[in-house]
Amino acid sequence: MKRSRVKVGFGALAVAIGIASVICLHETHGVREAPNASPGPSPEPTLAGGQPDVGEDAPNRPFRVPSGDPARLSCDAARHIVSQVREQLAYTPGPVDAKAFGSAVADWLDPYGLWSVAPDAMTAKSFERGASALLADIEGRGSADCAAAQALGTAVMPWISELRKVFDEARIAGALDDDAWSEATAPVFEGESVTRPAHELAATLGRRLASVVAEYRDAAPYVDVATARYFPSWTSDDWAGVVLASAVRAYVPLLDPHGAWAPLDEESSVYEVDIEAHPPLRLWDTCERTAVGVVIESGAAAPLADGDVVLSLAGVATAGMSLEQIDQLEIAAAEDRLSVDAVVLRGASGLVAVSLHPNRGDTSIASDNAQGPGDLPVDAIAFGESDALVVTISDVRDDLGDELTHGLLRTREHSERPIAGIVLDLRGNGGGSTDGAIDALGLFLPGVPLFPMRRRDGSIETDRAPEPPVVDRWRGPVAALVDANTASAAEMIAGALASYRRGPVVGERTFGKGCAQEHLDDDERAGVLRLTTLLYALPDGKPVQRVGLNPTLRLAFEEPGPHEREADLIHAAPTWRGPDVRDRRVLARIDDGTWAGSWPAHGGHVGPCRDAQVCKALRLLGAPASRARRFVPPKGR
């Protein structure tokens, strides 16, 4: 079966990611070793995690330490969350396809390839047959007590019992011929495509855990936790709750292609775009799930070491955790302000207890990936008798305005030639923060009204660009370079420049994501939502959603853009044309040349450029016959 959990956020292109992958990848940051860290007795593994209060602003609270258990929802809770999603979505929701829903529920239910997605899973047909009834139940159109979830939960129980017998027989048969260390560190779960029969996986788990216990007696408690997670002895009510949580998780992205819901134990997965833009502290770089825990492949922060099998972290056993919970556990542990205990399996040393001090005033643990102000790549490229500054902006972060300000000021201060103009290279930029886009635009359009944004109730909000100090502003020529992968907040930047006739857009038609997402606590305080709550238009009212930006100067790139665009996504928000909110006084000053100058002629002298496409764009901007030489597109809409 193909696993395709869709995870997209504001500014991320809507692509299916095989989230069931056994590899976890991220940045690593240093951790100080505890002075007295030494081998010692292992703490008792636990299946319970902390229960911090849920704040109103979900991103500003620490991630909770996950429990290792899957989320459960009651029938009423599932319905309340679904109702909240349907009511707060920026547009009238369409019908969810029952077949796709059933497949997605089975996928979210099974983090191992054992319970419902394996090719021999006897539960697969149950999910196909029961999908329509389950969908009706969570939408409030079905039975009063969500009987479909109860039926599916009951159907899973005998299958788990059958697999447990296979597991027990393999474990009793004894250890594998391979050494126990190899068995403890060997990856065991498949990635995007699950092709291995569940019976085979159950037997493999049994033999590998038998090998580990035979060699490392102290690991027995962790093996017991692993066994309980792989083959849980839950009641039908327990299973029904897990099915309902999986149903909500499957439902939201099928209704909103940029949306998601995650339980509090896995909420970091809802913020993956934010985490990528602002990397948190980390304890390792890459890892893989094994039968008994998580093996660190690379980038371990001391006192952890590459090759360690992490059996527990912050008192929680790692075996049998979903990838989402492992990721959140590592972030939560690294964010701890005091110390965190871990137990690792370390080759001939056996079980080793270590104490981590992730954030005790040590500046060396600062994010390796975090950019400081002015870290945006800025290239000065010959443009006639002057230089054109080309700024590569790969994503739109909250602090893009500061980054752009510092980067341009630094380059301008050290430039030995006049600056002909600035090109914002937004190719491949999937977007990010609306605040970041608005702040960046303040450098070129200070104080102007920008994007009208409409909510479901018809109310319209309009933000203004900030008014940075005069020394930070750029009144000279500017342009945006875009391609088919330019989306969302990046389209905002390019589109605003064009709407105000401030500068041309060069390249090809953009992705067309004219909607924005917000993070919300669900009404049940059971998890976090990422939901499309706003549709936006350009300052002149032109739509972006499903349409994209048509460049002022077309430039065919050698590598074609993706075939899929926002308009191709199922249940993508509709196109919305907004009011014209432009400041007419600013338009008049731009048109008469008092606000900013036009791109000068380059006389054929451009480059050299590291990227040939950039030189092509610059030649278009300064060509005598180009509209960009005196950029005045048709007025109005």
Protein language model annotation of sequence segments:
Residues A301-L329, I422-R427:
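Conserved PDZ fold ligand-binding element
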Residues R249-S298, G374-A380:
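PDZ/PDZ-like peptide-tail recognition elements
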